[in-house]
Amino acid sequence: MFNIPAVAVSYLIGSLSFAVIVSKYYGMDDPRTYGSGNPGATNVLRSGKKKAAALTLLGDAAKGLVAVLLARVLQEPLGLSDSAIAAVALAALVGHMWPVFFGFKGGKGVATALGVLLALSPATALVCALIWLVMAFGFKVSSLAALVATTAAPLAALFFMPHTSWIFATLAIAILVLLRHKSNILNLIKGKESKIGEKR
């Protein structure tokens, strides 16, 4: 009965674009109008405002965490199925990528995906975060780190997630994040991808 409303609420939470919200708070340009045009922490960092970028990262991750954690806490009282939790997880990411509050022009979903994974399986999230950190510090390319960590997510989920529907949700999340990085993949192939903090 509450499965569909739970998914809808998760989508709305995911639709809160912290890159845009934080930028407006600090009187900065809309991140969709400069750099890569992506409303995410990496692009906000290109503005030179490290605090704004950090808040964007935390906000985007937190909304994924809160959306799924809220559903998990209320799972028994509301009679939500495990499949509904999986759908809630996916909906939070879809909201971030296609936010109803911001003209359906959202980000690439890396931070939000991490928050979602943290709520579903802390171990899976930890594996992905460690991979991202190693790649980011090693190569200084955020998109490369994100792509490798994203690819590893479904594999880690196979070992750490208790429900098949959650594993499939993680796979779907990984596919969406990879698809949103199509331009980054092409730039990596051409050797034109910018490094962390580098202005375009």
Curated annotation (Swiss-Prot):
Gene Ontology molecular functions: acyl-phosphate glycerol-3-phosphate acyltransferase activity
Protein name per Swiss-Prot or TrEMBL: Glycerol-3-phosphate acyltransferase
Catalytic activities: an acyl phosphate + sn-glycerol 3-phosphate = a 1-acyl-sn-glycero-3-phosphate + phosphate
Keywords annotated in UniProt: Cell inner membrane, Cell membrane, Lipid biosynthesis, Lipid metabolism, Membrane, Phospholipid biosynthesis, Phospholipid metabolism, Transferase, Transmembrane, Transmembrane helix
A Pfam family hit: G3P_acyltransf
Localisation per UniProt entry: Cell inner membrane
Transmembrane segments: 2-22, 51-71, 84-104, 114-134, 158-178
InterPro entries xrefs: G3P_acylTferase_PlsY (IPR003811)
Function: Catalyzes the transfer of an acyl group from acyl-phosphate (acyl-PO(4)) to glycerol-3-phosphate (G3P) to form lysophosphatidic acid (LPA). This enzyme utilizes acyl-phosphate as fatty acyl donor, but not acyl-CoA or acyl-ACP.
Record flagged with keyword Lipid metabolism: yes
